[in-house]
């Protein structure tokens, strides 16, 4: 019964990051100890253990004990190839959370995830006209500085703009920019028809095997130009 309940739940952020890290070739080989993963993500081992329990409940990975001199170690083994893992896991993945701020003037603001030093945030600014917000700006920003830019928040009655922030997972270990699969989840959640072309392009251009090849044929869409292309 407990397993059944867990399989209906959305993935926790850490479990989701582990899957996306696996798909983005952040792990060397298929066999990493729980401690190595905890060190890689700079989180406590208990957090990795809970994420592993959820991955096991969904049938995405399983834990095994090492042999010989490594008997004291517990390893995480992945049960699916990259394409199969993505196809199976996407229905349990969550889009980034959204926050709204009422402001006098539009400005950038940093939002950091728990345990993440780096964050990519999407900002949508709505101009208030006749008391109702209207879309006037949409874009992506990336920064490594926590207080690079702040926003002046005011009461809704005093605001001229409503700024919408999308909070993404931290940049993956060994990477220096946001990964395309997290962008895919974020654009899917926006409900913005202008993003649909970029949304299709993300899967088309994702490097599934680590050698620069594009997405498998069953994921292919019409090639499009956009900010997410490689």
Segments the model singles out, each with a brief description of its role:
Residues 1, 87-230:
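Long, low-complexity, charge-rich intrinsically disordered regions
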Residues 23-29, 173-174:
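Short helix-capping/hinge SLiMs at alpha-helix to coil transitions
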Residues 42-57:
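Short amphipathic alpha-helical interaction segments
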Residues 56-67:
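A short, conserved structural fragment
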């Amino acid at each position: 019964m407990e397993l059944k309940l867990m399989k209906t739940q959305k993935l926790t952020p850490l479990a989701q990051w582990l899957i996306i890290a696996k798909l983005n070739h952040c792990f060397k080989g298929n066999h990493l100890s729980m401690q190595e993963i905890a060190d890689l993500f700079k989180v406590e081992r208990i957090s990795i253990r809970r994420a592993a329990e959820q991955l096991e409940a969904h049938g995405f990975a399983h834990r095994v004990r090492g042999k010989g001199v490594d008997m004291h170690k517990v390893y995480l083994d992945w049960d699916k190839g990259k394409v199969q893992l993505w196809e199976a896991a996407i229905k349990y993945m969550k889009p980034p959370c959204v926050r709204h701020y009422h402001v006098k003037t539009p400005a950038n603001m940093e939002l950091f995830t728990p345990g993440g030093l780096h964050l990519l945030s999407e900002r949508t600014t709505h101009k208030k006209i006749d008391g109702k917000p209207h879309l006037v700006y949409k874009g992506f920003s990336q920064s490594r500085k926590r207080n690079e830019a702040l926003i002046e928040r005011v009461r809704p009655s005093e605001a001229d703009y409503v700024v919408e922030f999308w909070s993404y997972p931290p940049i993956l270990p060994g990477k220096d920019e946001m990964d395309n699969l997290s962008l895919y989840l974020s654009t899917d959640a926006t409900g913005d028809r202008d993003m649909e072309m970029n949304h299709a392009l993300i899967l088309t251009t994702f490097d599934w095997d680590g050698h620069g090849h594009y997405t498998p044929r069953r994921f292919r869409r019409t090639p499009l130009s956009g900010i997410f292309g490689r």
